[in-house]
C-alpha cells in the first residue's frame, strides 16, 4: 500500500477479475504503522475493485464462519467477543498479523487464522532472518502453518515488500487453501 495514491485503484484491479468473493482486513501499513495516511483512499480502491473489507464483521458460509480482525499494531485486534457468538460451526479468522493468534480465546472449535504481515522475512539469509524475525515479531512466524493452544495460523508470504523493493530466496506467493 505504498503505491502512489493515484495508482491504488489500478494496482488492485487484478482482484476484480477473481470470480469469487474477495475479503480483506487492514494491515499495519494500511493503518499508518508505519505508512502514509491512505485509509480512505485504500477503502475506495478496494470497494471499486469489489473487495469487501470485513474488519469487525462476520461472513456466514454453510460450513463455517469468517471473521475479520483489525490490525494488532493499530490496537484493533479484539477477539474477546468470539466466545459470545454462536459456536455451532468452525471459525475462520482473517487477521493481518500472525502474532494475533495468541489472542484467540478458547472456543469449542479450534479456529484457523489466515495471516500475512511477515513477507516471509523478505530476504532469507540462513540463521540471520530467523534471528531478526524473533526480535521484530512476538512469535517469529515467517511462513506456513503453525499450531497454537487455541487456534492454528497459516502465514502467507504474500506479494508485497517493505523497505527495499527486493526479495531474496522468498518468492512472492498467492496461497490457495482448500478447507475440508
Each language-model region and where it sits:
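His/Asp/Glu-enriched short active-site or ligand-binding loop at hydrolase and phosphoryl-transfer sites
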Residues: 120-125
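Short, surface-exposed loop/helix-turn segments at secondary-structure junctions
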Residues: 127-139
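A conditional alpha-helix N-cap/helix-loop micro-motif detector
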Residues: 4-8, 94, 135
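Conserved catalytic scaffold of divalent metal-dependent phosphoesterases
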Residues: 30-112, 118, 136-180
Amino acid at each position: 500500500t505504498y503505491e502512489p495514491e493515484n495508482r491504488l485503484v489500478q494496482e488492485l484491479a487484478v482482484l476484480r477479475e477473481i470470480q469469487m468473493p474477495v475479503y480483506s482486513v487492514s494491515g499495519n501499513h494500511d493503518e499508518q504503522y508505519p505508512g502514509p495516511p491512505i485509509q480512505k483512499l485504500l477503502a475506495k480502491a478496494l470497494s471499486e475493485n469489489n473487495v469487501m473489507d470485513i474488519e469487525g464483521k462476520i461472513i456466514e458460509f454453510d460450513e463455517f464462519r469468517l471473521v475479520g480482525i483489525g490490525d494488532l499494531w493499530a490496537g484493533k485486534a479484539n477477539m474477546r467477543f468470539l466466545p459470545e457468538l454462536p459456536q455451532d460451526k468452525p471459525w475462520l479468522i482473517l487477521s493481518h498479523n500472525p502474532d494475533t493468534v495468541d489472542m484467540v480465546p478458547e472456543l469449542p472449535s479450534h479456529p484457523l487464522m489466515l495471516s500475512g504481515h511477515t513477507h516471509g522475512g523478505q530476504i532469507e539469509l540462513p540463521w540471520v532472518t530467523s534471528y531478526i524475525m524473533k526480535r521484530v515479531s512476538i512469535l517469529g512466524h515467517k511462513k506456513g502453518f503453525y499450531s497454537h493452544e487455541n487456534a492454528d495460523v497459516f502465514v502467507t508470504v504474500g506479494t508485497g515488500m517493505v523497505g527495499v523493493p527486493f526479495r531474496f530466496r522468498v518468492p512472492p506467493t498467492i496461497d490457495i487453501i482448500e478447507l475440508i
